[in-house]
């Protein structure tokens, strides 16, 4: 447990950590095929819950020790190579480029990140070049996935028999042959309506035999059928197993193949180190209309410019394409994709007509033909991302010996992400999942971009006195900036369907819609941390951070967030030295206060939207369309920090030469 772990603005021996921390190593990431960094944490970090919707390229929701906020965001902070990044940036990182991940869980560990760390912190360290010969590595994998339904679905015959029996049990069955199947009654009453939807008639009739005059072939009912089941003496010949069952889920699924390839280079000397990689991911979904592709380029370099100055820079470039086909977030109770649509369709609803063509009726059980809608719906999102992390570190002890143990470090990081979301729904799209519009040939083209940068200046002081006192001091100042802007266009009755969302101008412009958005926010912070160790047994960590956020009200922008933690290395005490099988035993307790400012940047001042002022002051309609404005968000001059105070008590242990380790 003496391995070094990242703790936020520095590193520590794992045995000296006073807060709640879980580490996920490179070895753990390689143990199973993962497409993003968050999947590597799943099931490997206690107290971390990851909920995914299984769409390729989706990150899912991460919760560290549950939710902390009622209305604001509960997402953790992601820090990549010391630079805070947005949650979406995790999709742009190739998991094979990750050296380690540390999850900070309690307030005493996360308080060093102030308001940004209120929901926990995920620290990611990417690979760096290593001293030695140039090494070139290739990693490639291919995996398969399918959807294995745990539900034993009824076939068509079982469903109609069940419907009929439920009516018999309710004394509501009205067949001419007692309780026996009746082709003149059942087709309309229990089979979706063969009179109203003629395409169902051949499917339903397959369970019966008919004479040349169209009447059903009859047979003698058995004594059991007459006395127990309530059949008439003569009943139609009937076999429900002959009713075809449409394999809707088979139509929309497949055995998905995922390819993952990476080529990396590592090189280094005592003065410089270099790591670079090229990676390609091609992930199919078991649903035929979904897939994901990602291309990444990663470059990390460090140079020991002089004995006292080290500089480094990392650049990550990414491009990804997500195709989602039929997808909806309309409500929490409806189907969300083509597979959900398929499970909602009746098993007796045919996908093809008698000529083998796709059915596209205007109503009835086959109206939302899954095969037809897959062909009519396209949803594609393209991302272009760039992340920069850089640092310069000055060791004053190498300049003047009395200053040994004092270092200055400046970090600068930036992130740019551009997204284009294109959606197109053709003329035969049947709106199966509750979309807002049922207009024909609808196209959406949404563009958004995000820019963020972070600047941090830090001073580190590490001193040891009389061999038993170890003192560490960290002082930091940081500034952060975030900017987002977007534009969206909606077009109806597009003239060129093959142009998808690239020709929205050729549409019914009287129905077109356009919107745009912009927001920016700033944060500033000052932080101090003290680490003290007595005889390498008794540990104290004190942290204080002064945070300011532009999103909050004028008088509430700044606040102070403290934390404290104590730890006792019981295994270092003399009374345990004779017990050889106990290698690590540490008891820790921590308390901290964190803040959350994840609110709309303009909520304190309110927001205005334009609106036709046709009915001002309840005076009735005005003949001219006069443009007015109304408040969409009421101003809140008292909006301040949402604070969470928490206490954590834990124990870390390692037994039998640390073959058995754990935390509680």
Predicted regions and their residues:
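Short, small/polar-rich motifs associated with maturation and membrane association
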Residues: 1-284, 288-298, 310-312, 359, ...
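Extracellular/periplasmic, surface-exposed regions of secreted and cell-surface proteins
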Residues: 2-3, 29-34, 38, 55, ...
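Generic structural signal for well-ordered, non-transmembrane alpha-helical segments
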Residues: 164, 346-349
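Polysaccharide-binding surfaces and accessory modules of carbohydrate-active proteins
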Residues: 324
């Amino acid at each position: 447990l003496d391995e070094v772990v990242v703790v936020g603005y520095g590193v520590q021996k794992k045995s000296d950590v006073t807060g709640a921390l879980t580490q996920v190593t490179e070895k753990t990431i390689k143990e199973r095929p993962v497409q993003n960094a968050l999947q590597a944490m799943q099931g490997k970090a206690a107290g971390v819950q990851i909920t995914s919707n299984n769409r390729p390229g989706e990150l899912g929701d991460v919760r560290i020790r549950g939710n902390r906020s009622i209305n604001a965001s509960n997402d953790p902070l992601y820090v990549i190579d010391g630079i805070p990044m947005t949650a979406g940036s995790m999709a742009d990182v190739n998991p094979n480029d990750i050296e380690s991940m540390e999850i900070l869980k309690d307030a005493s560990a996360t308080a060093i990140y102030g308001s940004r760390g209120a929901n926990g912190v995920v620290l990611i360290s990417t690979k760096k070049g290593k001293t030695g010969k140039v090494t070139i590595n290739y990693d490639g994998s291919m995996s398969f996935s399918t959807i294995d339904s745990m539900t034993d679905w009824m076939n068509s015959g079982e469903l109609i028999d069940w419907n009929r029996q439920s009516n018999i049990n309710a004394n509501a069955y009205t067949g001419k042959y007692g309780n026996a199947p009746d082709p003149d009654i059942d087709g309309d009453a229990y089979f979706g309506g063969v009179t109203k939807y003629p395409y169902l008639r051949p499917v339903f009739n397959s369970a019966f035999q008919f004479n040349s005059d169209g009447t059903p072939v009859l047979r003698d009912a058995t004594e059991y059928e007459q006395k127990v089941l309530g059949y008439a003496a003569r009943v139609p010949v009937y076999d429900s197993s002959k009713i075809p069952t449409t394999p809707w889920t088979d139509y929309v699924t497949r055995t998905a193949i995922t390819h993952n390839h990476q080529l990396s280079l590592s090189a280094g000397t005592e003065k410089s180190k270099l790591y670079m990689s090229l990676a390609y991911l091609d992930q199919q979904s078991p649903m035929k209309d979904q897939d994901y592709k990602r291309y990444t380029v990663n470059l990390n370099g460090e140079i020991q410019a002089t004995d006292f100055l080290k500089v480094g820079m990392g650049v990550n470039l990414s491009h990804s394409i997500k195709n989602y086909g039929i997808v909806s977030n309309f409500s929490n109770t409806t189907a969300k994709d083509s597979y959900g649509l398929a499970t909602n369709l009746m098993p007796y609803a045919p996908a093809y007509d008698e000529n083998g063509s796709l059915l596209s009726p205007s109503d009835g059980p086959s109206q939302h033909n899954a095969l037809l809608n897959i062909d009519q719906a396209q949803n594609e999102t393209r991302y272009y991302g760039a992340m920069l992390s850089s640092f310069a570190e000055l060791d004053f002890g190498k300049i003047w010996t009395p200053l040994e143990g004092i270092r200055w470090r400046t970090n600068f990081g930036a992130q740019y992400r551009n997204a284009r979301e294109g959606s197109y729904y053709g003329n035969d799209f049947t709106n199966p999942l509750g979309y807002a519009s049922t207009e024909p040939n609808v196209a959406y083209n949404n563009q958004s971009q995000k820019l963020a940068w972070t600047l941090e200046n830090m001073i580190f002081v590490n001193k040891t006195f009389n061999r038993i006192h170890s003192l560490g001091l960290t002082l930091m100042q940081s500034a952060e900036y975030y900017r987002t802007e977007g534009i969206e266009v909606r077009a109806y009755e597009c003239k060129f369907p093959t142009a998808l969302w690239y020709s929205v101008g050729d549409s019914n412009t009287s129905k077109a819609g356009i919107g745009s958005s912009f927001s920016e926010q700033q944060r500033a912070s000052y932080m101090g941390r003290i680490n003290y160790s007595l005889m390498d047994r008794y540990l104290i960590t004190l942290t204080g951070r002064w945070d300011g956020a532009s999103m909050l009200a004028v008088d509430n922008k700044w606040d102070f967030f403290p934390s404290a933690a104590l730890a006792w290395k019981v295994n270092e005490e003399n009374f345990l030295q004779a017990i050889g099988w106990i290698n690590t035993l540490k008891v820790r307790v921590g308390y901290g206060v964190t803040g959350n400012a994840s609110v709309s940047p303009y909520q304190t001042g309110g927001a205005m939207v334009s609106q036709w002022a046709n009915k001002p002051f309840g005076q009735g309609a005005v003949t001219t369309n006069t443009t007015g404005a109304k408040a969409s968000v009421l101003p809140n001059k008292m909006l301040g920090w949402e604070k969470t105070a928490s206490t954590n008590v834990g124990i870390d242990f390692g037994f039998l030469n640390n073959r058995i380790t754990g935390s509680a």
